[in-house]
């Protein structure tokens, strides 16, 4: 259960907040929607906020626009890969969410999964793909069916299922367009879930039911046939299990502030961590606000909680 948090509104109302959104990644349009929603929430709470498209990022380094805290609403490379976090640290500007090193680790599926394998956090078997690989051998080694993913893209961009060598070769080419590193994961066939984390506490899990082959970009942002079940319907024991696993995965990367952990059950029902999102979407369709609402936290309060959690 999420604890009540007393928000220091007097403190926040005296600050100048920059909302960094947009950017140049493949998730730009989603980031624009997230930033606008955050801006509306802060404005409604009387907080002095400025929207800054990352393409115009020179502004927040300019003396003409002094900012106390940056609310990072950038998704994907350029926002979740540690680049902007390192820059803000150089400028000594405080910001929401995880630090640069944690962001770099979380955005890389192969690096984070390698760590989880080492410390016993359950995640699907995987292999980094190369153009010279024997696709049939690779497929056999991962159980005969795989999900191919770009290493550092979010929102399921560039992901493809493969059930034979020809499909695997094609899937590799698709993913390679989005990332220099491509991985193949053993196919997980159980239900998909996500667990949001706010100030080191877990929010109720969400079960995702997609009408498409898998929960892809279209299903996430444009489909009316994707169902989000929250609370997810898990038993109390299973809910505790998935929340503990999500929190362990999050903390193992030294992530902080807020984030979302995506998981999927295997054929035996065991939960497997897919990835950690260090800057979850904050649109009307986004999962983080849905989980917060299930915990009794409305959107405006959620935004204030994230902002108030930035260390003074």
Show which residues each predicted segment covers.
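ATP-binding N-terminal substructure of ATP-dependent carboxylate-amine bond-forming enzymes
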Residues: 1-101, 105-111, 130-138, 308-311
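ATP-dependent carboxylate activation and anion-phosphoryl transfer catalytic cores
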Residues: 2-15, 118-120, 235-312
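Active-site nucleotide/adenylate-binding loops and adjacent lid/helix of ATP-dependent enzymes
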Residues: 2-20, 49, 64, 105-185, ...
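A short glycine-rich, hydrophobically flanked beta-strand micro-motif that places a catalytic Asp/Glu
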Residues: 50-55, 182-186, 256-268
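Short, flexible, mixed-charge acidic loops at enzyme active sites
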Residues: 84-89, 214-222, 278
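A glycine- and small-aliphatic-rich helix-loop capping segment at beta-alpha/alpha-beta transitions
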Residues: 86-95, 164-165, 169, 295
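Phosphate-binding site of ATP-dependent enzymes
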Residues: 163-244, 265-272
């Amino acid at each position: 259960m999420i604890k009540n948090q007393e928000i220091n509104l007097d403190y926040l109302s005296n600050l100048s907040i920059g909302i960094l959104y947009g950017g140049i990644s493949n998730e730009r349009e989603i980031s624009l929607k997230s930033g606008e929603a955050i801006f509306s929430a802060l404005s409604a709470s009387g907080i002095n906020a400025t929207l800054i498209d990352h393409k115009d990022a020179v502004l927040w380094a300019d003396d003409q626009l002094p900012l106390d805290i940056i609310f990072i609403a950038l998704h994907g490379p350029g926002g979740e890969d540690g680049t902007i976090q390192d820059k803000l640290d150089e400028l000594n500007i405080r910001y929401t969410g995880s630090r640069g090193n944690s962001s770099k680790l979380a955005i890389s599926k192969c690096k984070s999964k390698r760590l989880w394998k080492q410390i016993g956090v359950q995640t699907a078997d995987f292999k980094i793909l190369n153009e010279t690989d024997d696709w049939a051998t690779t497929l056999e080694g991962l159980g005969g069916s795989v999900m191919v993913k770009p290493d550092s893209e979010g929102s399921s961009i560039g992901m493809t299922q493969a059930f034979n060598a020809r499909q695997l070769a094609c899937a590799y080419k698709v993913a390679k367009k989005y990332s220099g590193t491509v991985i193949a994961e053993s196919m997980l066939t159980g239900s998909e879930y996500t667990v949001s984390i706010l100030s080191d506490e877990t929010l109720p899990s969400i079960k995702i039911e997609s009408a498409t082959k898998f929960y892809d970009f279209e299903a996430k942002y444009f489909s009316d046939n994707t169902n989000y079940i929250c609370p997810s319907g898990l038993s109390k024991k299973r809910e505790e299990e998935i929340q503990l696993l999500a929190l362990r995965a999050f903390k193992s990367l030294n992530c902080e502030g807020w984030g979302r952990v995506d998981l999927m059950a295997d054929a035996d029902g065991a939960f497997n961590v897919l990835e950690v999102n260090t800057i979850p979407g904050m649109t009307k369709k986004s999962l983080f606000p849905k989980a917060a609402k299930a915990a009794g936290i409305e959107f405006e309060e959620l935004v204030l909680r994230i902002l108030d959690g930035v260390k003074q």
